[in-house]
Structure formats: C-alpha cells, structure tokens
Design a protein with these regions (language model features):
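C-terminal motif of bacterial Sec signal peptides marking the signal peptidase cleavage site
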Residues: 19-22
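Hinge/cleft segment of the Venus flytrap/periplasmic-binding protein
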Residues: 34, 173-174, 185, 189-192, ...
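Hydrophobic alpha-helical
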Residues: 91, 97-116, 182, 201-262
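Hydrophobic alpha-helical segments within soluble ligand-binding/sensing domains
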Residues: 83, 138-163, 177, 206-209, ...
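Extracytoplasmic "Venus flytrap"
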Residues: 37-56, 60-64, 70-84, 88, ...
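Bacterial signal peptide processing site
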Residues: 24-26
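Short, solvent-exposed amphipathic alpha-helices that sit
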Residues: 49-63, 145-149, 173-193, 207, ...
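Flexible loop/hinge segments that line or gate small-molecule binding clefts
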Residues: 105-144, 152-155, 162, 255-265, ...
Length: 317
C-alpha cells in the first residue's frame, strides 16, 4: 500500500511539473486567438503616399480585429539608418509581423536577414531590398510604370528637346527602376530627347524646387521634366509656376496627393503616374495575417498604376 501511495505521489508531482512547464513555454503568439503586434515602417510620415499606406493598413487591422498596429517612420525625410534601428526595435519587442518600405535597397538588407533569423514574417511595401530575405513584396511594377511615363512624356514634347529628371533617393529601388524604365522608353521611341541633368531631392519639395530652378536657368530651352515621386513632382511644379513656364516646360510626375491634384488643375503638371498605396497597406496586413495562420501567399504582387491627366482627374478625387 505504501508503495502504491509513493507511485501516486510521484505521478502527481510529475503531472504538476509538466503542466507548469507547458504553461511557461506558451506565449501570447502561440495561441491563434491571441492579440498580434504588427509594425509598419515607412520611409517618412510626410508624403501622402505613406499616409495612404498607413490608412490602408489601419483599415485592414480594424477589419481583422485583435491586432495592434504600430506605425513608425523617420522624423524627417528618408533615413535608412533610422529605419534599421526601428526594425531592430520591432525584433526586440517581439513583433509578430513587420511591414517595411525600405528607403535603401542595400542598407536595409542586413536587418531583413535579422528579421528572418527571428522567424518574423517580413512584408515589403513599395520598395525592394537586395536579398531574398522577405516573405512577400507588394509594389508597383516600377520599371513598367517608368516606361508608361516615358511614353506619355514623349508625346507631350513631340519627341524632342532637352529634359531634366528629378528622383528622390539614388539608392531607392523605386527610383532606380522608374528611372530605368523612363530612360529606356525615351531612347526607344524618342532618340531626339536629350537628358541634360539627373538630380536627387531626397523627396523634399523645397529642394526639388531649387534643383528645377537651377536646371531651367542653366537650360533656357528646356522642354520638360520627369519626376519619380510626390515630393519631387510638387517641388518641380512650383518651380515651373514660379518661372512662368507652364506652357513651355512639360512635367510628368508620380503619385497622388492634394498638391498633385492642384498642380494638374493649374496646368503645371501635365500627367502623373498614380500608384495604389492604400492597397499596399491594406493587402500587406492581410498577407502578414495569412502567413501567421499558415496560409500560402503570393510572393510578388503588382498593385498597378494609372496615368492621370486633367481629362481623367476625377478618378483620383
């Protein structure tokens, strides 16, 4: 009898230890119904493009429920070092998923490797990295969008003349791809167009204005500009307006904002290639959610573009 009691006592202790250890090893993230923490890191919190990404993500989070969305962005304009620090913070805070719009194709790749090592799903938004350390990538087909801008631009300037180009950041995959697409198409269909200057504004409107003013001053016979992001587009549009050249200097830009709508309406901007940043944020959250729930997702998603002019401006109002 005593032996039986000892066996029962031993089994009771063993069962208790098993329960304690199993509870200790279980975290919030182990339960499919536990609240999840998603971190969204964009290039800045100034351009309407990134605010649209944020709005899309917020709306999807509300729809899904039980998700905390943390929005992070450098205080000023693009800062890859600050983005890296924010991503490392998200890893340390045990984020369940990270959505990242990398401002530098190379500089953000090392932290992407850390995210992968931490077994955290990484969804790239808008821009690429130089490695394959991500789970999904939602973006415009930027090279094709650049080609579309080139076709539009060539028609506006009748296939000839001097032009300037203003991008945001030289190391951003979006600027690289859009510039490549634009220049390739121009060489193909309008070889008499001469690119006299390619400059970078860091997406800052005031800097883009100064750059465009200098280019027009140095080239009085300039026929137009191509700009590959919202900040550059608005800065160049303001320079064209300030110099009274909206009838002689054609501008084809990128992105949608209240400022681009006004520039289309006042004639300083002739066309803008409009992306779908809201969809990037909205679908990005859904993809992260699906990955966490064991579902397969498409790795590359083209979120599409439209060329908007004064004639079809209602589609972005």
């Amino acid at each position: 009898m005593r032996k039986l009691n000892l066996i029962i006592s031993f089994l009771t202790i063993l069962l208790a230890l098993t329960l304690i250890l199993s509870c200790k090893g279980k975290t919030k993230s182990d339960s499919p119904n536990a609240s999840k923490k998603f971190v969204l890191i964009t290039m800045d919190s100034i351009d309407e493009h990134w605010l649209s990404v944020k709005k899309g993500a917020e709306d999807k989070v509300k729809e899904l429920g039980n998700i905390e969305l943390i929005f992070r962005a450098p205080a000023g304009k693009t800062d890859p070092n600050e983005q890296t620090r924010m991503a490392e913070d998200a890893i340390n805070q045990k984020a369940d998923a990270i959505l990242l719009a990398p401002s530098d194709i190379a500089a953000l790749s090392p932290v992407a490797a850390k995210i992968k090592e931490a077994n955290i799903p990484l969804i790239l938004i808008d821009s690429a990295i130089s490695t394959e350390d991500y789970d999904a990538f939602l973006s415009t087909d930027n090279e094709a969008a650049g080609e579309l801008a080139g076709e539009t631009f060539a028609k506006l300037v009748n296939g000839k003349g001097k032009i300037g180009i203003v991008h945001a950041q030289p190391a951003a995959s979006t600027a690289i791809a859009r510039g490549k697409g634009f220049e390739t198409k121009i060489k193909e269909i309008a070889p008499d167009i001469k690119i006299v200057s390619v400059q970078y504004s860091d997406g800052d409107k005031a800097r883009a204005l100064n750059i465009a003013t200098d280019i027009m001053t140095a080239n009085p016979d300039l026929v137009g500009f191509f700009t590959s992001n919202e900040g550059s587009t608005i800065g160049v549009a303001r320079a064209i307006e300030d110099m009274g050249k909206k009838d002689t200097v054609m501008l084809v830009g990128f992105d949608k904002s209240q400022d681009t709508i006004r520039a289309l309406e006042n004639g300083t901007l002739k066309a803008t290639v409009v992306q779908n940043p809201y969809k990037m944020g909205f679908d990005g959250v859904q993809m992260a959610f699906d990955i966490l729930n064991g579902k397969k997702v498409e790795r590359l998603i083209d979120t599409g573009v439209n060329v908007v002019t004064l004639e079809n401006i209602d589609i972005i109002k």
